[in-house]
From Swiss-Prot:
It comes from Physcomitrium patens. SUPFAM superfamilies: L21p-like. InterPro entries: bL21-like (IPR028909), bL21-like_sf (IPR036164), Ribosomal_bL21 (IPR001787). Belongs to the bacterial ribosomal protein bL21 family. Keywords: Chloroplast, Plastid, Ribonucleoprotein, Ribosomal protein, RNA-binding, rRNA-binding. The gene is rpl21. This is Large ribosomal subunit protein bL21c.
Length: 114
């Protein structure tokens, strides 16, 4: 059983009991997310349960993914180097993206856990 959800500008294939990293988590700041914060994700695009497949247009009604935040963290630093040739103009800076790791507890459709 799995579901495809939309969160943080990405589409993820999620299964109960697994954890995932998301960059832009809804409208929550990564610093405000504490450990074991319960979350509900309503943007469910598709649910597959054994032989049945439910597809939303664009999202499924009455479908919810229940989970909790494990922790928020910063991803690895990327270095950006800009240079104009023959001008002696150089600029080097880095960036670390905020990210949150969450675990999927259950997939619910029409109020029932699948």
């Amino acid at each position: 059983m799995y579901a495809i959800i939309e969160t943080g500008g990405e589409q993820l294939r999620v299964e109960p009991g697994r954890f995932y990293d998301i960059r832009h988590f809804a409208s929550l700041k990564s610093k405000n997310l504490s450990s074991n914060t319960k979350i509900l994700i309503y943007r469910v695009l598709m649910i597959r349960n054994e032989t049945t497949i439910n597809i939303g247009q664009p999202w499924l009604k009455n479908a919810v993914i229940k989970g909790r935040i494990l922790h928020s963290h910063l991803e690895n630093k990327i270095t950006v180097y800009k240079m104009n040739s023959k001008k002696k103009t150089r600029r080097k800076f880095g960036h670390r993206q905020n990210s949150a790791r969450f675990v999927v507890d259950s997939i619910c459709l029409d109020g029932k856990d699948l």
